[in-house]
Amino acid sequence: DLKDILASPEEPAAPIAVGRRSVTRAGEALDADSEKHVHHYPAADLLGKMMIPIIIDVQAKSVDELGGLVRHGGEEYLYVLRGSMELHSDLYAPLPLGPGDSVYFDSGMAHGYVRTSEEPCSVLAVCAGQGIQQLADTAAKRQRLSQEAELPE
């Protein structure tokens, strides 16, 4: 029936947020340490993001020190801010990267970042697609653990 086709759905669609933004001032990103790297999550206050930006201080100097490669759903863009590193994966030879270099890859491929410079290495990683909620949950867990470690006993 034409009336049924033109009728509004019974449940309204979820509203689409327009004009969202999140400002993260220098030094104010949500920080979460792991044994492998230090992660800084800008825009941590913005929920339901379509991508997750992460500034990573790459500390591991070998895949063994990383404890192996990781994989997660989605895609990842990596841009080296300072220092040098290698992107290791289960499909390609190690890829050397220096300041200003970038790579876009399927993060379902096992991967890991290894610092090759003596000086500190920092990268901007932007994760998008399937699996980013898992990354957000991991970030929240890392922050909780970091805060608990800082509490006096």
Q: PLM features: what roles do these ranges have?
A:
Residues 50-56, 104, 118-133:
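A short hydrophobic beta-strand segment most commonly corresponding to one strand
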